[in-house]
């Protein structure tokens, strides 16, 4: 499959500036394209302004635009486009921001851009997403960590990769927390979806996909889950081509 993907676990590390750690990767990802204008999908950003979703999306666009402008890139948001599907068809690259994955998926289906983005990526359009934006590149949203604040018409997502990502993957619960660990939740998913593979993508890491090549980048290993198997660790630089 033709695809150029930058799938980022998280936007910001503790104590760092917004989109601080992945900036150089974003710059490197976009450099060969010569593309400067990137269509931004802000639909996961529901809590940036309490007055309305529209103002929340405005605030999200402004925040991301400030970072991307420092990289010589321009963000323009799909929520301001009269025809979202037409905007995707004309876009040279797309960036999908993090936040609530359920709201993101609901809006992507409602506006009709889910299938359109998939087709454009298959035609060569560059796709980047962080957190929820990496989740929607998967077959389904079922390995998100988010509260189901709204009900999408379908859990189906872009299906740009044949495996699931669990972004912000944590190895253990915070001290004193009595709920399930992230590993237990993923194992529950695999009990019901036994033919799927899940990548636990730790913070400060990303997956770089170039057609049928995939590479883990960042400063930490990833964790691979399959039903009936012990989880496996893969370091940066490991051969993970089998995922595709």
Which stretches of residues belong to each language-model region?
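Portal/gating segments that form or line small-molecule/metal binding sites
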Residues: 39, 45-109
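Catalytic nucleophile loop
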Residues: 95-98, 121-140
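Catalytic-core regions built around general acid/base machinery
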Residues: 90, 110-124
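C-terminal and late-domain segments of enzyme folds
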Residues: 2-33, 43-45, 49-59, 143, ...
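A general structural motif
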Residues: 2, 33-38, 91, 124
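Structural motif
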Residues: 6-7, 93-97, 128, 165
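Hydrophobic anchor at the start of a short beta-strand
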Residues: 36, 75, 127, 222
């Amino acid at each position: 499959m033709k695809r150029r993907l930058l799938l980022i676990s998280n936007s910001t590390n503790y104590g760092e500036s917004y989109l601080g750690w992945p900036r150089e990767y974003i710059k490197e990802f976009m450099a060969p394209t010569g593309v400067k204008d990137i269509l931004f999908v802000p639909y996961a950003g529901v809590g940036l302004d309490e007055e309305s979703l529209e103002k929340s999306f405005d605030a999200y666009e402004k925040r991301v635009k400030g970072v991307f402008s420092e990289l010589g890139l321009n963000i323009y948001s799909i929520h301001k486009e009269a025809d979202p599907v037409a905007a995707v068809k004309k876009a040279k690259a797309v960036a999908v921001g993090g936040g609530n994955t359920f709201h993101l998926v609901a809006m992507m289906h409602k506006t009709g851009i889910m299938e359109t983005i998939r087709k454009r990526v298959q035609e060569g359009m560059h796709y980047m997403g962080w957190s929820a934006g990496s989740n929607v590149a998967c077959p389904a949203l079922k390995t998100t960590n988010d509260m189901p604040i709204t009900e999408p018409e379908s859990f189906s997502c872009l299906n740009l990769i044949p495996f699931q990502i669990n972004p912000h993957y944590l190895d253990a619960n915070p001290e004193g927390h009595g709920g399930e660990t992230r590993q237990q939740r993923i194992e529950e998913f695999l009990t019901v979806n036994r033919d799927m593979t899940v990548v636990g993508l730790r913070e400060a890491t990303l997956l770089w996909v170039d057609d049928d090549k995939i590479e883990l980048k960042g400063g930490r290993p990833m964790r691979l889950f399959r039903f009936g198997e012990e989880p496996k660790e893969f370091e940066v630089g490991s051969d993970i081509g089998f995922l595709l």
